[in-house]
């Protein structure tokens, strides 16, 4: 093989053109298997349908504002773009929930790594907490953000009397 290529390369340019007119290329790329490719699933598959809302209990007129995203599978042996998105979303540590907005830019990233993560809506039974209440909140495994109400010392003294 190397001898054939060497003899073709060492010939003058005029003879090289005549020698390669009827010759097909020696390297065929049709049989090469590319392990990872980006998703080519059409966007229509990801659009919500009325059946989905009935099945999962969502409301299309009042969508939830925040997602709880948890990584449930490893990123080992996954392509670099999935690892980059996991890092951007702050999901390097498995089974640690992160809160993200329900906006199209974040949803596009979540769609790429949907097979590695679990997404739940964040439920706010007591409403959205204020800045002062953020230190007194607790995120339950059911997806509820509960605000713990602290008692003021004046209230405690009034209750003792």
Swiss-Prot record:
GO biological process: one example: translation
Alphabetical list of InterPro entries matching this protein: Ribo_uL30_ferredoxin-like_sf, Ribosomal_uL30_bac-type, Ribosomal_uL30_ferredoxin-like
GO MF annotations in UniProt: structural constituent of ribosome
Subcellular location: Mitochondrion
Keyword Phosphoprotein: no
Signal sequence range: none
Keywords recorded for this protein, A-Z: Mitochondrion, Ribonucleoprotein, Ribosomal protein, Transit peptide
Top-rank lineage group of the source organism: Eukaryota
Record Pfam families: Ribosomal_L30 (PF00327)
Classification via CDD domains: Ribosomal_L30
GO cellular component: mitochondrial inner membrane; mitochondrial large ribosomal subunit; mitochondrion
Residue range covered by the transit peptide: 1-34
Record carries keyword Transit peptide: yes
Subunit details: Component of the mitochondrial ribosome large subunit (39S) which comprises a 16S rRNA and about 50 distinct proteins.
UniProt record similarity statement: Belongs to the universal ribosomal protein uL30 family.
Protein name, UniProt field: Large ribosomal subunit protein uL30m
Highest classification ranks of the organism: Eukaryota, Metazoa, Chordata, Craniata, Vertebrata
Protein's gene: MRPL30
């Amino acid at each position: 093989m190397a001898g054939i290529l060497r003899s073709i390369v060492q010939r003058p340019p005029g003879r090289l053109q005549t020698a390669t007119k009827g010759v097909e290329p020696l390297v065929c790329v049709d049989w090469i298997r590319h392990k990872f490719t980006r998703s080519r699933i059409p966007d229509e598959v990801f659009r919500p349908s009325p059946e989905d809302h009935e099945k999962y209990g969502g409301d299309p007129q009042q969508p939830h504002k925040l997602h709880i995203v948890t990584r449930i599978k490893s990123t080992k042996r996954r392509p670099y773009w999935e690892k980059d998105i996991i890092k951007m979303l702050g999901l390097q540590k498995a089974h640690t929930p992160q809160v993200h907005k329900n906006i199209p830019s974040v949803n596009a990233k979540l769609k790429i790594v949907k097979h590695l993560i679990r997404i739940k809506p964040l439920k706010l039974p007591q409403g959205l907490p204020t800045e002062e209440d953020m230190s007194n909140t607790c995120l339950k495994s059911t997806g509820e953000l509960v605000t713990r109400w602290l008692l003021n010392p004046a209230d405690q003294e009034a209750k003792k009397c």
